[in-house]
Design a protein with these regions (language model features):
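Class I S-adenosyl-L-methionine-dependent methyltransferase catalytic core
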Residues: 1-237
């Protein structure tokens, strides 16, 4: 698997000092589906911010059975909990993006944990250690050297489920890059693809320039979550 490095960090996950400072191990688990109850590896590193269990559960309650049959793209994956929750609940496959090599190794261990509960699922999960913004640039350029990182090579009839849960500060410090990344994916995604955006109250969902139903906007302080679909009336309902 080709691994790409970039000077810019797209890590959710980095809110502090140099790599190496670690917190104690903290519990993280799959909440629903075939792998329900599976404990995931997570170091407790203060620079890694997985979506809280209660928020993840609420998000998947909003998505409901619509998770099934989709290809998941987890943009700022960290431990991979969002992608793995979706796989457990019936998603077909996943592209998992993580820039930090030590964190990606933990994610790889979590794939092994899922494999024990769902034999064969490892083959459907593609972990890429790369900068998310660099990856998005390659998709915009339709770079033929990166077909393995480009979800556009998937069968066009398979809709996506895109999770965007970056460091909240990115909505301020890298706002334009984030909006461009999401615009690129929105324009590339098959019809009826579903985007799940987690931010805090510094971000205005109107900046996405998509219609999000009030029923698909939820607040779980400090998290604000919005869901929208592409290419169908569902995104406007």
């Amino acid at each position: 698997m080709k691994k790409n490095k970039s000077r810019s960090s797209s890590k959710k996950h980095f809110v502090g000092s140099e790599p190496g400072s670690r917190g104690k191990s903290v519990g993280l688990r799959i909440i629903g589906g075939k792998c329900r109850g599976t404990a995931l590896e997570y170091s407790g590193d203060h620079r890694v911010r997985p979506m809280k269990d209660r928020v993840r559960e609420a998000v998947f309650n909003l998505i409901g059975p619509d998770v099934r049959g989709r290809h998941v793209i987890d943009l700022f994956a960290g431990t991979g909990a969002l992608a793995f929750e979706a796989i457990s609940r019936g998603a077909l496959s996943a592209t998992v993006l993580e820039i930090h090599f030590p964190t990606a190794e933990i994610t790889r261990k979590n794939i092994d944990l899922l494999e024990r509960r769902m034999p064969g699922c490892r083959e459907s999960i593609h972990l890429i250690t790369t900068d998310v913004f660099f990856w998005g640039q390659k998709i915009r350029e339709q770079d033929p050297g990166y077909p393995h990182v480009n979800p556009a090579v998937l069968p066009p009839e398979i809709p996506w489920l895109v999770f965007c849960s970056p460091p909240y500060d990115f909505y301020v410090s890298r706002k334009e890059e984030l909006l461009l990344l999401l615009k690129t994916l929105r324009e590339t995604a098959p019809a009826n693809s579903l985007f799940v955006i987690e931010a805090d109250n510094r971000f205005h969902f109107e900046d996405l320039q998509v219609a999000i139903s009030p029923r698909k906007r939820k607040s779980y302080p400090p998290a604000e979550v919005g869901l929208f679909y592409t290419g169908t009336a569902a995104g406007e309902s």
